[in-house]
């Protein structure tokens, strides 16, 4: 394809190893191979569509020639085949138009989906910030007695969670506080 010999390929690999390093070289090779596969797939798709279009054009040309030769002068068998060719040409034309329409709508649909996803991603963030604002407002409205009651409730809940998580032996063996550790060092 590119007329690259083995020695040139080895030279490219060594240069890639020096430039990219051993960690990034395999990733770069995979990326390039994915690009090549995608390009080959697109080229094959275009080639198939061109072949179908050429077949359609040939069928239309043969139909026009047959019409110009006056269909009434032809034998009944030949007129049947001409009608079949017309039907096939119309069918192929409809299929190609459908594929073209589907390709156009899928791209437009994908663009709409991406825009909707971006808008939906922004909405939950706004909703969270509104909830946080409401929470801070409700905390600011609380009286000091409410806060102390809330703190004791939170302490009880925290102790129950900690006691269920840690076995009783771990609770008794607690690290020394700063005042105890300074007394032992003195």
From Swiss-Prot:
It is a single-pass membrane protein. Disulfide bonds: none annotated. The keyword Protein transport applies. Keywords: Cell inner membrane, Cell membrane, Membrane, Protein transport, Translocation, Transmembrane, Transmembrane helix, Transport. It is found in: Cell inner membrane. One of its GO terms (biological process) is protein transport by the Tat complex. One of its GO terms (cellular component) is TAT protein transport complex. The keyword Transmembrane helix applies. Coiled coil: none annotated. Gene3D superfamilies: 1.20.5.3310. Residues 162-186 are annotated as: Disordered. The chain crosses the membrane at residues 1-21. GO terms for molecular function: protein transmembrane transporter activity. Residues 177-186 have a biased composition (Polar residues). Belongs to the TatB family. The Tat system comprises two distinct complexes: a TatABC complex, containing multiple copies of TatA, TatB and TatC subunits, and a separate TatA complex, containing only TatA subunits. Substrates initially bind to the TatABC complex, which probably triggers association of the separate TatA complex to form the active translocon. HAMAP family: TatB (MF_00237). Part of the twin-arginine translocation (Tat) system that transports large folded proteins containing a characteristic twin-arginine motif in their signal peptide across membranes. Together with TatC, TatB is part of a receptor directly interacting with Tat signal peptides. TatB may form an oligomeric binding site that transiently accommodates folded Tat precursor proteins before their translocation. This is Sec-independent protein translocase protein TatB. The gene is tatB.
């Amino acid at each position: 394809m590119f007329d690259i010999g083995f020695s040139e390929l080895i030279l490219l690999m060594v240069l890639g190893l020096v430039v990219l390093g051993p960690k990034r070289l395999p990733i770069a090779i995979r990326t390039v191979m994915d690009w090549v596969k995608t390009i080959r797939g697109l080229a094959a798709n275009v080639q198939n569509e061109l072949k179908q279009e050429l077949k359609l054009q040939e069928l239309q040309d043969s139909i026009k020639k047959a019409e110009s030769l006056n269909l009434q002068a032809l034998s009944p068998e030949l007129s049947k085949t001409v009608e079949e060719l017309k039907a096939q040409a119309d069918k192929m034309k409809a299929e190609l138009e459908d594929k073209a329409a589907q390709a156009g709508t899928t791209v437009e649909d994908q663009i709409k989906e991406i825009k909707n996803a971006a808008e939906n991603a922004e909405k939950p963030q706004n909703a969270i910030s509104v909830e946080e604002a409401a929470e801070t407002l409700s905390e600011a409205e609380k009286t000091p007695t409410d806060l102390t009651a809330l703190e004791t409730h939170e302490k009880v809940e925290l102790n129950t969670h900690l006691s269920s998580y840690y076995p009783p032996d771990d609770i008794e063996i607690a690290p020394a506080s700063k005042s105890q550790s300074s007394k032992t060092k003195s």
